Amino acid sequence: MKNRSVVIGISAIQQKGDFENLDEALALMDQAVKEALSDSGNKLVKDHIDEIRIPKGFWRYRDPGKWIAKNNDFKNIPTTYITKIGVLQQNLINEACLRIEKGEINASIILGGEARYKQLRSVIEKKEYFETQLDENPDFYIKAKEDLYGDEELAELGAMAVGYYATMETAIRKYDGEKIEEHQNKICLLYTSPSPRD
């Protein structure tokens, strides 16, 4: 191992409000990068970023990574990856860490963003939702090596993750010997406890 991979800047953005006060996913991702660079303590770190990895969202952009690099005046345009459905999000982090540790890259941005609430508000408020048009392809599209689920799982649980999460929570609850209400309260505590960063 040549280098040690560490997180040097993070950001998370959540918006609420009326349609006009909400941003599209591209603007949210751009703002998250700006805040993460600021959080790093040295905004010049942007000149050492060699790649940007983004899980494909519900948006239509082909390559938000290159747009964000240009919009933030990165010295070099990083290699961009868009990972499609079926690739675990943790894999983006794992790949970046591995490449840093091998000395293949200096730094990576792992980025994601959605504007589903703005899309919902557009329906409620009867407004038209537009996205910035980005037609340039990323350097790499990453697809899952195999299907995420088998035919039996698809028939019983569907294609949405919610069924799988419920199944995992049921298994955890059973393993811990908890009653349903007891397990629900435990999960509620997880989500209502203050964040370590607060």
Q: What do the predicted segments below correspond to?
A:
Residues 1-26, 139-158, 169-170, 174-182, ...:
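Condensing-enzyme catalytic core mediating Claisen C-C bond formation in acyl metabolism
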Residues 12-34, 56, 79-91:
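Active-site pocket-shaping loop/turn-to-helix segments
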Residues 31, 94, 162, 166-170:
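Residues on a specific face of well-ordered alpha-helices
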Residues 37-49:
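Phosphate/pyrophosphate-binding loops at sites that engage ATP/ADP/AMP, CoA/4′-phosphopantetheine
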Residues 49-55:
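Short glycine-rich phosphate-binding loop at a beta-alpha junction
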Residues 56-121, 125-150, 154, 158, ...:
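Conserved catalytic cysteine-centered active-site region
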Residues 191-198:
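Conserved small/polar residues in nucleotide/adenosyl-binding loops
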